[in-house]
Amino acid sequence: MNIRTIVIEGHEQDVKISRTERGAEVTIEQHTRRAGKQDICIAHIARDENRESRYAKATEVAKVVYGTDCRGRAAATNSMVHEVLNEMERVAGC
């Protein structure tokens, strides 16, 4: 069974994780007057990437999902970042 897309309800906007040929792509939806709706990619996850690299990308995605603190870090605990990483890896097929 392959999961193609997962949508996570974020702090201010939803985060969409979609399966690609090489792994997964994490996007957010942005609305502009000129272009209308656009999907902005915030991370690419390759199946053959090492775990540290995927964790660093999950930390950046967690900033969008959970918001940031006053220092600009993700307002999430380590286990919350691991939950985001787990969903990204499920879609990518890691």
Segment roles from a protein language model:
Residues N2-I40:
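Amphipathic, interaction-prone secondary-structure segments
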